[in-house]
């Protein structure tokens, strides 16, 4: 493992830069770059700080997120280190760019940990660039004194693409963004790769898969720090580290990296940003509730009360939620790069049809193999190749039947068999519309 500084000049695109291609980076544990000078300046001055942990289910675990907050608090016992849990399992930087204002910026953090390399692993390079650069520019546009730290995790399935000693593709794309904006990065998986290759660690310690990507099931501990065969068990599923093994290794990487990061950079606002690496990055996002005057709805629907059993658990992610039954139709117009709905999928999920500018609709099923429970998701409502053109979006909730039992994973089918009534309804639940651009009245 090594700590080294990047030689690429901030604000300058790499030679031959192509946003649709990936140049895989050497596997290095940390690049301090511009450091976290504003964050550390507040700590050294004895001022309270707030850290936002922004990512997917690995960040949602009681792992490196909890360990690092505790570490900072122990290092600076005379200040209050506050933490914002802004992680949602099974989601990537695309939803991250949309929900940034509600889940992170309104708390005015001093530091944002950004962890999306695993959940962005299947996203094309241009998609990662649009959302991750949008996150960076949105943070600094609203909070110029907030520092940002990219952290990378890994999974068993990503190890083959990290041969011989390169970062996985998603992290490599994020490194280019970090270079351009002088953002420090920590790859928390370097030691894990070394231990696995030397036969001292097993990535997947059980044949059991995860049935949920949220909630208490994520927070598991290994029975032993070392298995009977002498190997460290990293995770049950090869993805979500055990709290007392994999996440400890992640935290050790953070500890090793922080001294050089602390020494880097100069205090001051992240102002006068260079032009975007990609012109259509998702920097300017607006959030529109479904009862907005410019959103037209017909058919059966309601604004759910805050004690609704399905939507209540998600009120920390949106101000309100709405439910639409079969026959409901939603129409709105927008101008910009794209639009999406912040929806909930689960046992009651039905089938919706989405039409753009009156074209043949595409089908979006609000149910998947995990859906023994309800969880947040994002429903794509289309891109626009011309951000100045007004687009009309129509969402129809159909009564099309779904063979939900057939869709569920085999280990989830018993839940259907015991509770068939739980799956009978066909509904569409959503909290708001995200637009990279603006809504048109």
Predicted features and spans:
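Solvent-exposed loop/turn segments at secondary-structure junctions
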Residues: 57-60, 88-93, 118-123, 146, ...
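The substrate-binding groove and active-site-proximal loops of carbohydrate-active enzymes
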Residues: 89, 117-127, 158-165, 240, ...
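Charged helix-capping and loop-helix junction motifs
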Residues: 127-134, 167-171
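Oxyanion-hole/transition-state-stabilizing segment in secreted/luminal serine hydrolases
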Residues: 44, 52, 64-66, 93-129
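N-terminal secretory targeting modules
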Residues: 1-54, 59, 65, 73-79, ...
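A short helix->loop->beta-strand "cap" motif at the edges of active sites that frequently abuts
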Residues: 141-149
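A short beta-strand-loop structural module common to alpha/beta enzyme folds
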Residues: 79-91
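Substrate-gating cap/lid alpha-helix
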Residues: 156-191, 197-199
């Amino acid at each position: 493992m090594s700590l080294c500084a990047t030689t690429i000049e901030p604000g300058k695109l790499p030679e031959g830069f192509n946003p649709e291609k990936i140049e895989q980076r050497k596997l290095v544990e940390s690049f301090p770059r511009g450091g976290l000078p504003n964050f550390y300046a507040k700590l050294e001055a004895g001022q309270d700080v707030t850290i936002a942990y922004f990512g997917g289910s690995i960040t949602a675990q009681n792992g490196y997120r909890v360990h690092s907050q505790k570490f900072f608090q122990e290092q600076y016992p005379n200040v209050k280190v506050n933490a914002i849990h802004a992680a949602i399992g099974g989601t990537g930087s695309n939803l991250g760019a949309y929900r940034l204002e509600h889940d992170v910026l309104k708390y005015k953090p001093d530091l944002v940990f950004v962890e999306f390399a695993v959940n962005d692993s299947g996203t094309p390079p241009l998609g990662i660039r649009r959302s991750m650069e949008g996150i960076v520019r949105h943070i600094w546009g609203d909070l110029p004194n907030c520092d940002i730290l990219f952290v990378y995790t890994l999974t068993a399935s990503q190890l083959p693409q990290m041969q011989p000693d390169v970062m996985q593709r998603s992290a490599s794309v994020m490194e280019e963004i970090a270079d351009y904006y002088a953002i420090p990065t920590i790859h928390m998986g370097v030691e894990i790769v070394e231990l696995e290759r030397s036969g001292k660690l097993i990535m997947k310690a059980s044949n059991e898969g995860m049935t949920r990507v949220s909630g208490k099931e994520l927070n598991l501990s290994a029975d032993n720090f070392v298995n009977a065969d002498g190997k460290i068990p990293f995770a049950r599923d090869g993805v979500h580290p055990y709290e007392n093994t994999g996440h400890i290794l992640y935290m050790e990487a953070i500890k090793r990296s922080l001294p050089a990061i602390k020494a880097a950079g100069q205090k001051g606002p992240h102002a006068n940003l260079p032009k975007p690496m990609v012109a259509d990055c998702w920097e300017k996002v607006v959030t529109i509730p479904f009862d907005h005057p410019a959103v037209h709805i017909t058919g059966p629907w309601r604004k759910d009360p805050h004690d609704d059993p399905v939507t209540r658990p998600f009120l920390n992610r949106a101000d309100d939620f709405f439910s639409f039954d079969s026959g409901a139709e939603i129409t709105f117009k927008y101008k910009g790069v794209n639009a999406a709905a912040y929806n909930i999928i689960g046992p009651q999920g039905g089938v919706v049809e989405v039409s753009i500018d009156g074209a043949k609709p595409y089908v979006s099923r609000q149910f998947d193999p995990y859906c023994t429970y309800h969880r947040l998701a994002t429903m794509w409502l289309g891109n626009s190749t011309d951000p100045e053109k007004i687009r009309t979006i129509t969402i129809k909730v159909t009564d099309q039947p779904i063979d939900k039992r057939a869709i569920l994973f085999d280990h989830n089918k018993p839940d259907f068999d015991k509770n068939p009534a739980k799956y009978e309804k066909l509904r569409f639940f959503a909290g708001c519309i995200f637009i990279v651009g603006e809504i048109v009245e």
